[in-house]
């Protein structure tokens, strides 16, 4: 089993010019938790997926969930039901913690 305590979760994020490079804190068939870094201007295209939670640690941007778009900033949390489309655009460098369960 991987570490269970991460003192500085933001420092785990990896930033790359070609897009997000998720860093898994845990990855099992039942559950995934990851840290993602996006550079300003990068995006995650709108796509359907399983139920998920996104908690923003750094930066500002926009997140689309279904037909709604929300401003994201440190401390914001977005919860998305299974099958609902979601995506995001980073206005500044963004770091978020994501988790999702089994489909």
Could you say what each language-model-derived stretch is?
Residues 19, 32-48:
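Conserved short histidine dyad/triad with adjacent acidic residue
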Residues 29, 64-68:
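Short strand-coil-strand connectors
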Residues 37, 48-63:
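Short, conserved beta-strand element in jelly-roll/cupin
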Residues 82-103:
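Ligand-binding loop in jelly-roll beta-barrel domains
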């Amino acid at each position: 089993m991987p570490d269970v305590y991460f003192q500085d979760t933001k420092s785990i994020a990896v930033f790359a010019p070609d897009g997000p490079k998720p860093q898994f804190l845990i990855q099992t068939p039942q559950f995934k938790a990851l840290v993602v870094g996006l550079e300003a201007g990068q995006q995650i295209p709108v796509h359907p997926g399983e139920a998920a939670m996104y908690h923003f640690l750094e930066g500002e941007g926009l997140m689309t969930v279904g037909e709604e778009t929300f401003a994201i900033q440190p401390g914001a949390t977005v919860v998305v039901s299974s099958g609902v489309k979601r995506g995001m655009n980073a206005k500044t460098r963004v770091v978020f913690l994501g988790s999702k369960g089994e489909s």
